[in-house]
Amino acid sequence: MNLIGACWMRRSLDEPVSALFIDDNHNIIAGGWDGRLAKWNASGDLLWSVELPDRVGSIAANENGIYATAGLHLSALNSENGALMWQHPLEGSADIVTTVDGLVYATSSVYDIEHNDFIDSAIWCFDLAGSQLWVKHMPERPWTLDELDGNLYLGLGRPKMGVAQVSSGGDVEHKALDSNSSVTASVNF
C-alpha cells in the first residue's frame, strides 16, 4: 500500500521529528532531534522555522505563544513569527510542557548513570511573561503532564508511581492506583 497517496500534506523538517503539536487553528508545529522548531498553517504553508538549543521534547501552545522543551531549556516563542520571548534552563533534562489557565508548567528530570535511574525530578510553574512562580522537587519522574477539568495531573514512575494532582500554587497530592506500574502514557480529549 502506498501511504504517500493518502497524505493530504507532506512537509519536511529536514531532521528526524521528535515532537508534534496541532493547535486550535489546525496549524502544525513540529520539533526535531537537532533543535529545529517549525510551524505550518492548515494549508501546509511554512510560516516560520527557528533553531532551539537541543532536541525538542515537548510542545504546547495557547493564545499567547508556543512553548517547547529543548534539551535543558524551556523556551517561549511568538506564535506569529517564532521569535524567542523567553528561555529558562531547568535542572536536568527539560521533559514535558503544557499550559493551563494562563500558566506554563514544565517537568524536568535528572538521570544518574551510576544508579541507572532518575534521582530527582521537578515540576516548574511560570507565568506568561516567563517569571518563575514556583518549583517542586520529587523523587518520582513524571512521565506525563495533562490537564483535566482545570486540574493538572502527573503520571509518575518509581518510587511512588501512580498519579499526582498539582494545584496552581504548587501543592502536589499523590494518588495511588491499583497497579504497581509507572504511568507512562495518557490520553486527553
PLM feature spans:
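Short loop/turn segments that connect beta-strands within beta-propeller blades
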Residues: 41-45, 78-82, 126-131, 167-170
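WD40 beta-propeller blade core
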Residues: 38, 75-76, 124, 162-164
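Conserved beta-strand element within WD40/beta-propeller blades
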Residues: 29-31, 67-69, 106-107, 154-156
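Acidic/polar residues in short coil/turn loops that connect beta-strands
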Residues: 23-25, 34, 43, 62-64, ...
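A short helix->beta-strand "capping" segment at the edge of beta-propeller domains
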Residues: 1-15
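Repeated scaffold domains used in trafficking and secretory/extracellular systems
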Residues: 15-21, 54-63, 91-101, 138-149, ...
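Short, solvent-exposed loop/turn segments at conserved positions within beta-propeller repeat blades
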Residues: 68-69, 113-120, 157-161
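A structural motif specific to WD40 beta-propellers
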Residues: 8, 45-49, 83-86, 133-134, ...
